[in-house]
From Swiss-Prot:
FAD binds at residues 124-139, 150-182. Its cofactor is FAD. It comes from Debaryomyces hansenii (strain ATCC 36239 / CBS 767 / BCRC 21394 / JCM 1990 / NBRC 0083 / IGC 2968). This is NADH-cytochrome b5 reductase 1. Keywords: FAD, Flavoprotein, Membrane, Mitochondrion, Mitochondrion outer membrane, NAD, Oxidoreductase, Transferase, Transmembrane, Transmembrane helix. GO terms for cellular component: endoplasmic reticulum; mitochondrial outer membrane; plasma membrane. The gene is CBR1. Monomer. Component of the 2-(3-amino-3-carboxypropyl)histidine synthase complex composed of DPH1, DPH2, DPH3 and a NADH-dependent reductase, predominantly CBR1. InterPro entries: CBR-like (IPR001834), Cbr1-like_FAD-bd_dom (IPR008333), FAD-bd_FR_type (IPR017927), Flavoprot_Pyr_Nucl_cyt_Rdtase (IPR001709), FNR_nucleotide-bd (IPR039261), OxRdtase_FAD/NAD-bd (IPR001433), Riboflavin_synthase-like_b-brl (IPR017938). It catalyses: 2 Fe(III)-[cytochrome b5] + NADH = 2 Fe(II)-[cytochrome b5] + NAD(+) + H(+); 2 Fe(3+)-[Dph3] + NADH = 2 Fe(2+)-[Dph3] + NAD(+) + H(+). The keyword 4Fe-4S does not apply.
């Protein structure tokens, strides 16, 4: 007996089903690779994979994501929460990564270890391979290209971290024409964090980014500001108040209080108790 000829329609349908399944699987895997890792309500463990000391009490800590193609999933301008049980108490503190979602497979935190800083000492104690608990994102500021024509920024100490993250996002995008002026205050020259990176940004983008350093205790032949950030320094080195300008602040509370008051004297709207996206003055 002769064998019946295969039904071409069945063959076509089978091949089409196989191809469709393969394509669907490919895009599923692709979406998994690019899916954000962070969960806003659940702490997850991330291993320390690298530690780079940048000053006597400050390090850049690099934490690994589950896959080398993962992104953290943190909008520019927002932060994460680190949680730990310390002396039988649950402690949570917020930090802004200095990396962005352009970096895949890891994220970087710049953390200064304070003598009485529970979480900062907790992170400092970690060895390579050990984990910390993180959740996020959190925060009320999200940067989008072109949201303003210019930013004025004032940072004190580790308050540089959200500024650096926003700066990186702006300057990496050749289509983003936002201009940034940063006043960065510290005690001594050795306390200036990310100085090489900031100076490189200023050299490579002189039309888009300018920085002015202020030190309480400057070395000899110092050409930057001396003492505290004053209204005169703000007026000279930051953009004038306008509807197209935002002022971003991050640093020690006494400094922030003084800067908010000085900003009003320079024509900025009074800062609100809790900053929201769209405020002319935003405090991280």
């Amino acid at each position: 007996m002769s064998q019946p000829e295969p039904n071409p329609f069945i063959i076509f349908a089978t091949v089409a089903a196989i191809i469709s399944s393969a394509v669907a699987y490919y895009f599923f895997q692709l979406s998994r690779k690019n899916a954000p890792v962070l969960k806003p309500n659940d702490f997850q463990k991330f291993p320390l994979i690298e530690k780079t000391r940048v000053s006597h009490n400050t390090c850049v800590y690099r934490f690994g994501l589950p896959r080398s193609t993962d992104r953290l999933g943190l909008p520019i301008g927002q932060h994460i929460a680190i949680g730990a049980t310390i002396n039988d108490k649950e402690v949570v503190r917020s930090y802004t990564p200095i990396s962005t979602d352009d970096e895949l497979g890891y994220f970087d935190l710049l953390i200064k270890a304070y003598e009485n800083g529970n979480i900062s000492r907790h992170v400092e104690s970690k060895k390579i391979g050990e984990t910390i608990d993180i959740r996020g994102p959190k925060g009320f500021f999200t940067y989008t290209p072109g949201m303003v024509e210019s930013f004025g920024m004032i940072a004190g100490g580790t308050g540089i971290t959200p500024m650096y993250q926003i700066l990186t996002a702006i300057l990496r995008n050749p289509e983003d024409k936002t201009k940034v002026s940063l006043v960065y205050a510290n005690v001594t020259e050795d306390d200036i964090l990310l100085k090489e990176e900031l100076n490189k940004m200023a050299r490579e983008h002189p039309d888009r980014f300018k920085i002015y350093y202020v030190l309480n205790t400057p070395p000899e032949n110092w050409t930057g500001g001396v003492g505290f950030v004053t209204p005169e320094i703000m007026d000279k080195h930051l953009p004038k108040a306008s509807e197209a300008t935002n002022l971003l602040l991050c640093g020690p509370p006494p400094m922030i209080s003084a800067m908010k008051k000085a900003a009003v004297g320079l024509g900025y709207q009074k800062a609100k108790p809790v900053s929201k996206l769209g405020d002319q003055i935003f405090v991280f």
